[in-house]
Amino acid sequence: MPVALTEEQTALAAAVRDWAAAHDPVAAVRAAETTGAGLPEGFAALGLTGVALPASVNGADGTVADLAAGLAAAAEALVPGPLLSTALAGLLLAEHSKELAAEIADGTAHVAVQLDEEAVPGADAGSWLLVPRGERYVLVPPGAAVEPLAPFDFSRSLGRVKADVPGEVLDLPDVRDLAATLAVAEAAGVARWCLTTAVEYAKVREQFGQVIGAFQAVKHLCAEMLCRTEAAEALAWDAASAVGDPLAVASAAAVALDAAVENAKDCIQVLGGIGFTWEHEAHLYLRRALALRQWLGGSQRWRKRAADLALAGKRRTLGVNVGEDAEVTRLVAEIAALPEENRRTALADSGLLAPHWPQPYGRGADAAEQLRIDAALTAADIKRPDMVIGGWAVPTILAHGTDEQRERFAAPTLRGEVTWCQLFSEPGAGSDLASLRTAARRTDGGWLLTGQKVWTSLAHEADWAICLARTDPDVPKHKGITYFLVDMRAAGITTRPLREITGRSVFNEVFLDDVFVPDADVVGEPGAGWKLARTTLANERVALGRGSAVGENVEELLESAPEDVDRDRLGALIGQGSACSVLDLRATLRRLDGLGPGAESSVAKLLGVRHRQETAEFALDLASELVAETPAAQEFLLTRCLSIAGGTTQVLLSAAAERVLGLPR
């Protein structure tokens, strides 16, 4: 999902793209190889530098988030010139120099902003300058002594500013944070162009008789680029929306600056030889990404800043204001007054336990109502019980089962009277469910199931199982599969616990030896099990975490981190955790707008798994002793399953490349 979310932001980004399509900004960048390019003629008419400035200085009275959306689109098109620094200066000077701010808004003035390096992007003889002097900044009019330099990034001029240039001294707080807020939007735009370019090339470039996008290695490169792009865009949007929040911008810069650089490098890799040529523009985007990162002092600086802020107690929470529901508030208050042991039944009977389920078992709640219910439960300190596999099984029964099956299983599952396991995976069919071999043959009044299932969580204590078995071996493998409900106490079932690397036994292998399943326990039509299984795997409610934006696992790290903790590594985890939280938020906003899951959903598991595994490993590294039963050791071992269960990371990378990016199978 791009940085632009609102209709206004989307329209602004589209206007920038339309302008770029008509004016070929890349050609202007190429033409300025030795001098660096200025803002192209005619671009000022778009008014981008004045988008977030007040009407009192001829601005558009928009937000910094609006400006970020435009900057991301401009960077995606490689619009040259000091657009970023001029827009930054406009925000900084709107209350200090209204005349100059008005010139910035109408595009007649451009400004270069110095942060650390003597070489200043955008500085030339005609530019205004903002240069640091101690804790303050000096505003220098055009004509100051600026030594022109040959820029690494051709899309902007580069100049060395003479020390102690005279000018107006100003108190400008948070210059660097505001600069980073806008720069990460540009970084997100660069990352998006690199992803798009690599994917489009992979769809048409042929090698060994097929397009290279069909090769797993290329798919995984592109899928990793997708993950970086989505994280960068989400964090750029968040930093701009929460402008002034130092942890938001530090987290964004910790992730997005590197995302742009890594995507540019991987884009060249996918392009191969053509990507290494001067004629292809990929290197121009790599130059822009590297220049952005250097201008802000490198991403390590921002990882350390994120860690410093978090260790000092700075926190953020993310949320969506969907209002309150008086009836829900009343119901929740009544449930909160009950003894703990009675609350689950009350939640189930009121429809609050699974509000997204249809009535009478749920409330048929839309996304907004689900969030209002969650907020009310959180405020009352009521934790919703986890139905585990029941939360997947029952929605399939509700959608495809009989009235008798719904009556028999839905309410008892909600109340905790029936627990479930899932008999899907087999020794030869893990993620590839269509290859399962468990057979079901017809008998009087039902079916006899024979086969072996594995990796079945909680099978040793579950009451019922949802089970896939092959009822017709003579049709293509995705067909001929039927969806059964299996009583785990039935004759012919043998359950054997599997000891995991944690030393515990949660997984099991289950042997089925002529297990009788009556026709009344078949869900849907025989042979339609594949479609129903996909329904099971897709069922999820709308939810939004209400804790710290950096994530629960990072919070535990922060509580126990020693004074000499590796702040670069900690800051990276804070950035990752923030990315996961913001992706979750943006996915929720999509659902509130009535849209289906976007790329965020595909990316969220990939990033979330990696984040939790790396956080667990860091916690283990911080442990004073490597003792087997410590929480850190157990969590590290447990998290190794996350990149396997529910689809391995490698399978999910391929799926993201095919289903989100459109690369061929």
Predicted regions and their residues:
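Amphipathic, small/basic residue-rich leader segments at the start of a protein or domain
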Residues: 1-77, 301-388, 398, 408, ...
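Glycine-rich phosphate/cofactor-binding loops in nucleotide/flavin-utilizing enzymes
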Residues: 2, 88, 274-337, 368, ...
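C-terminal helix-coil-helix/basic helical segment that borders enzyme active sites and/or dimer interfaces
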Residues: 2, 25-34, 226-255, 269-271, ...
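Glycine-rich beta->alpha junctions and the first turn(s) of the following alpha-helix
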Residues: 2-14, 18, 146-230, 319-323, ...
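A short, Trp-centered hydrophobic/proline-enriched beta-strand micro-motif
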Residues: 29, 106-116, 131, 416-424, ...
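Internal helix-loop-helix
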Residues: 44-101, 352-411, 415-416, 458, ...
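A short core secondary-structure module
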Residues: 112-158, 398, 450-496
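Extended, hydrophobic interaction surfaces within ordered domains
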Residues: 188, 195, 208-313, 631
